[in-house]
Amino acid sequence: MLPKSRIISALLVGLGVALVVAGLVAPRFLLGDGRMPLDLENTTYTLYDENGTVKGDKTGVTRQLHMEIQNPANDEMVSLRVGDTLFQGNDGSDFDSLVSASTWSWEMDRVTGEPLDSATLSTVMVMPPAHVEMAGPWFKLPVEGAVDTRAEQVEVFDPILRATAPAILAGADKVNGVVLTYQQMVEPTNLATKYAALNNTKMVTDEEGNTEQLFLTYRADRLLHYESNTGVLVGIQEDVDLYYADRDGNRTEDYVTYSAQTEGDEQRQDALADIPSQSESQTVTIIVMVVGALIAVVGLIGALRPDRRQAASVSRAEPKD
């Protein structure tokens, strides 16, 4: 039967190895590597401006983004589905008040936020689904350790452009964690030069019977707020101006304008605040691995050290000259 000291040493070795392994896998359980959480709640982003305009008439304007996490999803990637609607007033149940509606579906890298393939875009218009190359993150930015989130400029996807636009770091606010704010400004852009859509152009006729083609033009100035530990979008503040212009870019007709910010930003931020940062996760990993290694070394020393009682019995058993 093994002596108790050997048994204890073997247990220490096992415990030490277990702690080292736990240290290696801890970041995945702590989400401290900046991955997109899969159990997010409160993922509806609603912006409402009671002083907006639609086709030149003053009216309330609501934009709503609803994000859903779907399968397939694993440690490396996640599937996202985002509904983006724009409507008059604050009740989206009335179809007649709908200005536009679209649904985006794509697969995303959980760490970097980068799309892994083209997005599938469906709209309420009588058009087949389109495939759009996103070419940049939207609802999640990379965090420190993958790519520096605090870069002065990042390319963030804009669904109205169907392309990325530069977003410049505007600040970092410490309110129950750190929220990074990026400013994204879109200069007046003729959307017909970006993609085909039913309302991107229109024909008008003047009093003399002359026809002219107008082009839907888009301008925006928005602030995007991202929680720093996860890189997840927690809030939006934007001024959006959509209008029709002639070939020279001169404004001729208003379409939609609004200035609003999302509700519930603090709740989204609070839900993410308990997730450890990457530095905290690394600290936990290092401490657990070091403690495990020390315990394993102590156990090995005890296991390999000669047993005193066995050595003494052998010494007594040896014949004397």
Task: Give the label of every model feature segment.
Residues 30-39, 262-288:
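Membrane interfacial helix motifs at helix-loop boundaries and amphipathic/re-entrant anchors
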